[in-house]
Amino acid sequence: MFGMKRLLTALLAAALLFSLAACGAAAADTAKEKPNTKPVVVTTLFPAYDFARTIAGERCEVSLLVPPGTEAHSFEPTPRDLLRIADCDLLVANGGESEEWLETMLDGIDGEVPVLYMLACVDPLEEEEKEGMQDLHEEEHEDEIEYDEHVWTSPRNAMAICRAICDELCTIDADGAAYYRQNCDGYCAELEGLDAAFREIVAQGRLGCLIFADRFPVRYFVEEYGLDYYAAFPGCADDAEPSARTVAFLIDRVREEKVPAVFTIEYSNEKMADVICEDTGCGKLLFHSCHTLSAGDLARGETYLSLMWANTESVREALG
């Protein structure tokens, strides 16, 4: 499955590089006509966008490459997107398998684009397949390591990423260093408060286990707070129908652990969760991974902090 995805990614990248070369001259002319005095920061995912815009404030132009509501794992960049990357002063990306297209793009761009990878800011964790999970990798090589890319789901990881973004901004705009560091310190203080709230909730909870009737993009979160978990699929696996065995396993766990509610993640069809809830009488809760927001979420002013604070209440309820 992943071999075919990589082939398609490479073909797409080659086509886009050709388009980039063709559009280069026109882009240069446009840049000359409309000079920009602010540093330009391009981000690939919402967490990076939210962190960067908070720290950069009014001193930088910060934009999000993956449009709101778009599934980041299936994002296909356009020639215009590539020009944005080529012309930016800093690119904040996630890294990892889902952004392999980006490496090919960067290799084909004349000059060097400063890139900060969120995965490089923390100690990455491998995806794991726990008991009861649907096996989606039967045809893959056993020695192929896949890292969980959702590093920001740990607030402490978010702090490390923010400090790294701040350092990069200070490098490309030394005159604004004091401003960036002040913004970063203030934001990290808010993240400290979020982290403290999660720790208190976990310490006071009756249970020490979360059950996801869905994909599982929050391994960094459960590792941070010492929680056990069960889930239907590892990481942000491709859409797949759960087996009867997987559903039955999760139903048994809900009953044995006396779990008050199971989790779904954003943009899930929730069918499996509905089956489990109907069979066991448990509730259903949302854990927003903050990976992708809808246009409506952005219009309402949702942020990483607002979504994660909403998650605190869900975790409190799920732990009993």
Locate the predicted segments by residue.
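Bacterial N-terminal signal peptides that target proteins for export
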Residues: 1-11
